[in-house]
Regions:
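Bulky hydrophobic/aromatic packing residues
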Residues: 24, 41-44, 70-76, 111
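Short, well-ordered beta-strand segments in beta-rich or mixed alpha/beta enzyme
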Residues: 4-11, 49-86
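Residue-level signal for secondary-structure boundary sites
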Residues: 15-17, 77-79, 116
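Short amphipathic alpha-helices in soluble, non-transmembrane regions
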Residues: 20-26, 82-90
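N-terminal first-folded block
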Residues: 5-40
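Glycine-rich beta-strand-turn "strand-cap" elements at beta-sheet edges
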Residues: 31, 35-62, 87-117
Length: 117
């Protein structure tokens, strides 16, 4: 069954270019590891929900926007194996990949794909 990783987090609007470069680099890394597709998105519209919202979920601050990233895998097993290998990469271990966002406010999870139209 297809599997999707979903990441949501805040990024300073002024860091759009830095985030785009980071997203491209991570996209290449995950595709090389076996992902079927990677989609990175720059936020533009975050309406308030009745009980929660994207903005409150990531504790959005003034001057920030929200980014999302969707990584599609053939299966959860493929994703788990790929992430285990990616975490062994020198760049991932050395911290040489600066992350242009506040990692403490990122939310993420894995989802079984139920359908696509």
């Amino acid at each position: 069954m297809a599997y999707m990783d979903v990441f949501v987090g805040p990024v300073l609007i002024a860091d759009k270019d830095a985030y785009a470069a980071y997203a491209r680099m991570m996209g290449e890394l995950t595709l090389q590891a076996g992902a079927l597709s990677v989609t990175a998105c720059w936020g533009s519209d975050f309406p308030d929900g009745m009980a929660n919202s994207f903005a409150s979920a990531v504790k959005l601050q003034p001057g920030e926007t929200i980014v999302t990233r969707f990584v599609r895998w053939t299966s959860k097993d493929m994703r788990d194996a790929a992430w285990a290998e990616m975490m062994k990469a020198r760049d991932m271990q050395s911290g040489s990949m600066p992350m242009p966002f506040d990692r403490t406010r990122v939310i993420f999870g894995g989802f079984e794909v139920l359908g696509e139209e």
